[in-house]
From Swiss-Prot:
Region (Disordered): 1-40, 67-102
Organism: Pan troglodytes (Chimpanzee)
Protein name: Protamine-2
Tissue distribution of the protein: Testis.
Record bears the keyword Iron: no
Gene (UniProt): PRM2
Family per record: Belongs to the protamine P2 family.
Cited Pfam families: Protamine_P2 (PF00841)
Gene Ontology cellular-component terms listed: nucleosome; nucleus
Length: 102
């Protein structure tokens, strides 16, 4: 899921801020070196910060690939789906524990 911030109609667009930033002298990525005023610092943090996050669920294509590999050998199953996210496994379909080949 990707979360975006909705801009209010009274708020200027990102292009206006970009023009203001490029109009001033730019040093490194520090906010003081760019000469940003306090309200521009807030805008800079909002537009260049890490407020956007992506949540990646197991896609159907990936799940299908995992299930396709499963029937090769029932004993040596590779558990790849959501291995890194063991607590929040609700987004993925859980596989059956028993072998369905018989």
């Amino acid at each position: 899921m990707v979360r975006y911030r909705v801009r209010s109609p009274s708020e200027p667009s990102h292009e206006v801020y970009r023009q203001q930033l490029h109009g001033q002298e730019q040093g490194h990525h520090g906010q003081e070196e760019q000469g940003l005023s306090p309200e521009h610092v807030e805008v800079y943090e909002r537009t260049h910060g890490h407020s956007h996050y992506r949540r990646r669920h197991c896609s159907r294509r990936r799940l299908r690939r995992i299930h396709r590999q499963q029937h090769r050998s029932c004993r040596r199953r590779k558990r790849r789906s959501c291995r890194h996210r063991r607590k929040h496994r609700r987004g993925c379909r859980t596989r059956r524990r028993t072998c369905r080949r018989h």
